[in-house]
Amino acid sequence: MSTKNFRVSDGDWICPDKKCGNVNFARRTSCNRCGREKTTEAKMMKAGGTEIGKTLAEKSRGLFSANDWQCKTCSNVNWARRSECNMCNTPKYAKLEERTGYGGGFNERENVEYIEREESDGEYDEFGRKKKKYRGKAVGPASILKEVEDKESEGEEEDEDEDLSKYKLDEDEDEDDADLSKYNLDASEEEDSNKKKSNRRSRSKSRSSHSRSSSRSSSPSSSRSRSRSRSRSSSSSQSRSRSSSRERSRSRGSKSRSSSRSHRGSSSPRKRSYSSSSSSPERNRKRSRSRSSSSGDRKKRRTRSRSPERRHRSSSGSSHSGSRSSSKKK
């Protein structure tokens, strides 16, 4: 079979004998060269590409020939003499790999070593770490522990073998049989009752003192309220006395005003009569001076008792009266 006319199709298999390595058709059950039967070890062949044929070669107008093949992975058309694709390096004839589902990484699922380990109840694990249940305990060497246990057991045996005659073991029984009449067993009950009574008395005293202090604290508050009411009543009486004194002063002022007006009206005809009856001017001058001085004293007394508002009113009234008297004199 010539290599030019040889075409690999899907299903062809390679002889499992390494010396032979012949590629057989898919329909053969034994090797065509060495006669070895087809087994599961025989690797299947897979065509990485297909020839384009005459029709596509004619359409390319002399660019490709009928023996050229097209890659199945990248669809690139390669020359017939190429065993691998020019673009993606896919082989033209490749061995069909078994579908195991592995990813195909480095050394994956190949020569895997499974080390069988047995769990032990020892103090340390397989990595030399101390187990959790032994971490809190201070465990020493086994020989030391055994020696300590042996010493303790020997000490206990020696203690048991000692004479017990030196110890008075019957003293407890003698003490139980002794007379209890010397001891006052009821004293504790009496003391408890006395303590309860004293506690009750102290509580009653504290309550009475508390009530007295509360009554004392309430008495100054009542005295304060009384003093406040008295001060309020005194202030109200003072305000009333002030208002009554003001009313009295007002009534007195009105009376003095009316009397001054009546005096002024009566004095003018007197002056006229005196002036007409008197014969000498000197007597008239003396009389007018004495009258003016008496009228000035009266005015001063009235103005002292009056308020500043009344003084202003009296000054205005006196000016009017002066103008009236001057007009009458004229």
Curated annotation (Swiss-Prot):
Residues 150-163 have a biased composition (Acidic residues). It is found in: Nucleus. A zinc finger (RanBP2-type) spans 9-40, 65-94. The keyword Repeat applies. Residues 211-224, 232-242, 315-330 have a biased composition (Low complexity). Keywords: Acetylation, Metal-binding, mRNA processing, mRNA splicing, Nucleus, Phosphoprotein, Repeat, RNA-binding, Zinc, Zinc-finger. The modification N6-acetyllysine is found at residues 18, 54, 92. It holds the Pfam family Zn_ribbon_RanBP. Residues 151-324 are annotated as: Required for nuclear targeting. The modification Phosphoserine is found at residues 9, 120, 153, 181, 188, 193. Residues 196-210, 251-273, 298-314 have a biased composition (Basic residues). Splice factor required for alternative splicing of TRA2B/SFRS10 transcripts. Binds to ssRNA containing the consensus sequence 5'-AGGUAA-3'. May interfere with constitutive 5'-splice site selection. This is Zinc finger Ran-binding domain-containing protein 2.
